UniProtKB/Swiss-Prot annotation:
Protein name per the record: Elongation factor Ts
Function according to Swiss-Prot or TrEMBL: Associates with the EF-Tu.GDP complex and induces the exchange of GDP to GTP. It remains bound to the aminoacyl-tRNA.EF-Tu.GTP complex up to the GTP hydrolysis stage on the ribosome.
PROSITE patterns named in the record: EF_TS_1, EF_TS_2
GO CC annotation: cytoplasm
């Protein structure tokens, strides 16, 4: 069968692979476009395997929501350039929507979820790797499924937040989600802060005090320490922080004024916890030249 330009074009549009790759696939499969597409998919899987050990620390946080059900997914790429590629962005949206419509509890479970096309998330990932030429990883999935007030917020594709409120409205929930994105509080309220953390901070504050302060009566010393600890606890709790949309009040005051309560939240930031590889090209050249 003759391999025409229109056949190559059709395969390119269908698979996103390069022109020469599509032509080769059609030649290898006697012009059968379905077999050629499958051949390219298998080639994509091979490329994915070769790239699997490369660090993917850039990427995007994507979200999907339907009522009180919402998800955040983190999908990583190797470079910020690919993180802005339309194929990558489309893939992250596919992953988020697939997560929303599945029962997958984490990223590992999500890999085997089937799309409407019949392929799995893992198979689609491999196909996108073939298009963009970088290692991609579906790294994290978090979800909230509740009858309460739920908001999903993503800032610049880099930080995502899910927050659940009992009471309040959509505007308040979104505002609280924006605050969490900006301020990254580890805990909701003071009672959530581990006792070990408080004890350690007390120890540190006491060590920092002057001998003159340490010589003060026990009850005064306790008041000084308690004041410092209270300030620290406010800094690490959502409720204790000044509300970014109205710094005249704390988040707790804003929430209680609306007759609401924050039940919990999830926050993801692209690449957090991943050690990025810092290339030292000078050292690499020296090593290859036997000078290091």
């Amino acid at each position: 069968m003759e391999i025409t330009a229109s056949l190559v074009k059709e395969l390119r549009e269908r698979t996103g692979a390069g022109m020469m790759e599509c032509k080769k696939a059609l030649v290898e499969n006697a012009g059968d476009i379905d077999a050629a597409a499958e051949w390219l998919r298998k080639s994509g899987l091979a490329k994915a395997d070769k790239k699997a050990d490369r660090v993917a620390a850039e990427g995007r946080i994507a979200t999907a929501q339907a009522g009180g059900k919402a998800v955040l997914v983190e999908v990583n790429s190797e470079t910020d350039f690919v993180a802005k590629d339309e194929n990558f962005l489309a893939f992250t949206d596919v992953v988020a929507n697939a997560a929303l419509n599945s029962d997958a509890a984490d990223a590992d479970a999500l890999k085997s979820v089937k799309l409407d096309s019949g392929e799995t998330i893992e198979e689609r990932r491999a196909a996108v790797i073939a298009k963009v030429g970088e290692n991609l990883q579906v790294r994290r999935l978090v979800r909230i499924d509740s009858a309460n007030n739920v908001a999903a917020y993503v800032h610049g594709g880099r930080i995502g937040v899910l927050v659940e409120l009992k009471g309040g409205d959509a505007e308040l929930a979104r505002g609280i989600a924006m605050h969490i994105a900006a301020m990254n509080p580890p805990h909701v309220k003071a009672s959530d802060v581990p006792a070990e953390f408080v004890a350690k901070e007390k120890e540190i504050e006491l060590a920092k005090m002057s001998e003159k302060d340490k010589a003060k009566p026990a009850e005064i010393l306790e008041k000084i320490i308690s004041g410092k600890i209270s300030k620290i606890v406010n800094e690490v709790t959502l409720y204790g922080q000044p509300y970014v949309l109205n710094t005249d009040q704390t988040v707790e005051q804003a929430v209680k004024a609306a007759g609401a309560e924050v039940i919990g939240f999830q926050r993801l930031a692209v690449g957090e916890g991943i050690e990025k590889v810092v290339e030292d090209y000078a050292a690499e050249v020296m090593k290859q030249a036997g000078l290091a």
